[in-house]
Amino acid sequence: MALEQALQAARRGDLDVLRSLHAAGLLGPSLRDSLDALPVHHAARSGKLHCLRYLVEEVALPAVSRARNGATPAHDAAATGYLSCLQWLLTQGGCRVQEKDNSGATVLHLAARFGHPDVVKWLLYQGGANSAITTDTGALPIHYAAAKGDLPSLKLLVGHYPEGVNAQTNNGATPLYLACQEGHLEVTKYLVQECSADPHLRAQDGMTPLHAAAQMGHNPVLVWLVSFADVSFSEQDHDGATAMHFAASRGHTKVLSWLLLHGAEISQDLWGGTPLHDAAENGELECCQILAVNGAGLDVRDHDGYTAADLAEFNGHTHCSRYLRTVQTLSLEHRVLSRDQSMDLEAKQLDSGMSSPNTTMSVQPMTFDLGSPTSTFSNYDSCSSSHSSSKGQRSNRGIPGARAADLQSYMDMLNPEKSLPRGKLGKPSPPPPPPPPPPSFPPPPPPTGTQPPPPPPGYPAPNPPVGLHLNNIYMQTKNKLRHVEVDSLKEPKVELNDQFAQPSSGDGHSGLHRQDSGLLRQDSELLHRQELLRHSTGLRRQDSDRKQRSFSKQPSTGDYYRQLGRSPGEPLAARPGMAHSEEAALLPGNHVHNGCSADSKASRELPPPPPPPPLPEALSSPPPAPPLPIEGAGAACGQRRSSSSTGKVRVLRHRKSTKSFNMMSPTGDNSELLAEIKAGKSLKPTPQSKGLTTVFSGSGQPASQPESPQPLVSPAPSRTRSPTPPASGSQPLLNGSVVPAPPATPAPGVHLDVEALIPTLDEQGRPIPEWKRQVMVRKLQQKMQEEEEQRRKEEEEEARLASLPAWRRDILRKKLEEEREQKRKEEERQKLEEIQRAKEQSEKLRTLGYDEAKLAPWQRQVILKKGEIPK
């Protein structure tokens, strides 16, 4: 009780309570909170100078006492920005400006770390601070200021120690690298333009600032670096990964689209993986779509022999594997229509962009590694992106036979090939069990006055329902990983001002192993293996040395500084808005995998588990893609079902926006999509072959008829067309006569009797004059010729554009679309003028007293020209 009162009084500045507690003899050096902080620490971090002086001068509490992490009250005052308390502690309290906490951080590091330029200025020019001192991880105060985005503090530090502009931490991170990683565009500009920071310096794993910006989804920073810093798209890290690999692996669609639009090449890394492999492996469906329609090889295999679809299926991303196998048989021009229509909402992933204003946030759970530069400065001793190689890091230590047998039996249970019934594997199913014998007692007589009951069935009663087949358990288990997360993991970006530097106590291994996507399912059949699952969360493919390109971070132990603004009695994990590492910091030394803490020592004792089930043999030569789901056919629509321009289909976009994403270009050009919607029987893009035959009446108004359904045999997915509407009540009338449904536009070289399409009788059964039928025939022939000519031009245009790169083809196609739009507007304007002119002519005829319905066309023209009919 006294502890809570003392801490609250120190934080509120309640000097009377402190005096009463001191009078009662309750204030002493042993009065510490859960992190070994004295009331002196709380007064300093709250800026209550009068309480601080009272506790030090009258109560005689030591002003140089240290908390559990080695922080003095001066460290607390610097971290919270209370300059007056810091000045008193350094000048009269006995604290020294160069004192370090357990991580090697001084008060200057903390002031820069938390963005207090006034404190930084006083320490540099009056407090005697040394800006060249590094922490245990090699971080200078300038690194902290760059990562924080504090430009005023950064300018002060650069002016005081200009040699730190290109200084690297123990893992090779420079201030520019950290600024790009955190998305601070103004800091990036300042470092490159005014401080001549080198944008080509690499971290220990070979990553450059361009890679860091692409990995975190900071599109403005990436665009500026490419435009003004003379960096190349093709720069590779030590594993051969480019910026496109990092953007695709994290689902940054805007970054990926910009790279493709500006000429970045789709290349392979040292493990044979393309950006499509990384996107599929991490379940980033929209990135897979962007890469597929921009020419990424769907059948490219990495050095382990896996295609992108294989990796997606292996990691449980069925929506990605289904899409990739569907579009594998399609040409590049038709992949835009091959969206996965059957994907459920829960399978959608949110765009995993970070703090960039042009990107969105991700809720994809991730693990955290102590060696990642994307963590905090506590982790700068092994700045490796998760993308570095894991070759040679497999443990060969043995485990007891019983545990190995348990692990093998568990993997066998997850193997659908071993757990499926024989009938599922293509072998003959065993015969059904014989029906049970009839009962030995006679049935009761039926009640009188009712009909006799029906005879008993001749088949056995159904078996009671059993649990899911093990193959279903396997898939559900794999898919469960993305949902096993604590609330704090929903914020993937751990802000640097929510954690602080501590020396990493991990095993020095950075990066995320390729993990089985769901070993955390709490199922009734898996509960007895819970202990085994806790130690096998980090399973990875035995036959693969290529790491999943998704950086990981482990929480640091710097929870002391993160709780400076917390109330004394408030639990650390209960504070709203707390970062992930704050919640996990109460368990120092434990690695957190997918939201569950695991014993690091026990996990290190376990060797890698047996290999996961092999891929089915059929995957080496994928079968033809199945047809896409059939949408309900409309009664008067003969076109193909639109995949993005209509609102009837599910939106594939698994990001925050509800707008359909155009797969060919980030600029929203839908020309190929519209062309395919209007295509005829073949899959070639023939925008004017609409599958419709237009018949003109005598007044020039068109009447459209849907085409008759034609059987379509193609290995590629096809969309079902609407059937021909019934003749009763739904077909249009032409001069009063029912028009038969004409066939589709004939293929080139096929003769079509146009005259047979024109009716001979009107709606009252009277014959149509021959001259009127001939006029209708000529108009129909002219229209068909125009359509055929337009179709030919469109085919030639598409053939010419197909040989161009995707980004240039997109620009030209957009330009052509703008020209078509201008032409369409001009035609609409002319049509409106013709309608207006016809109205004026009709009004003139009525004014002259003529009945327009009784005039022949030549008489009408003469009257309008001369004002009367010649005698």
Swiss-Prot record:
It is found in: Cytoplasm, Cytoskeleton; Cell projection, Stereocilium; Cell projection, Microvillus; Cell junction. Residues 428-465, 606-629 have a biased composition (Pro residues). GO terms for molecular function: actin filament binding; SH3 domain binding. GO terms for cellular component: actin cytoskeleton; anchoring junction; apical ectoplasmic specialization; brush border; cytoplasm; cytosol; dendritic spine; filamentous actin. InterPro entries: Ankyrin_rpt (IPR002110), Ankyrin_rpt-contain_sf (IPR036770), Espin/Espin-like (IPR052420), WH2_dom (IPR003124). Residues 522-548 have a biased composition (Basic and acidic residues). ANK repeats lie at residues 1-31, 35-66, 69-99, 103-132, 137-167, 171-201, 205-235, 239-268, 271-300. Residues 772-848 form a coiled coil. It comes from the Eukaryota. The WH2-domain binds actin monomer and mediates actin bundle assembly. This is Espin. The gene is Espn.
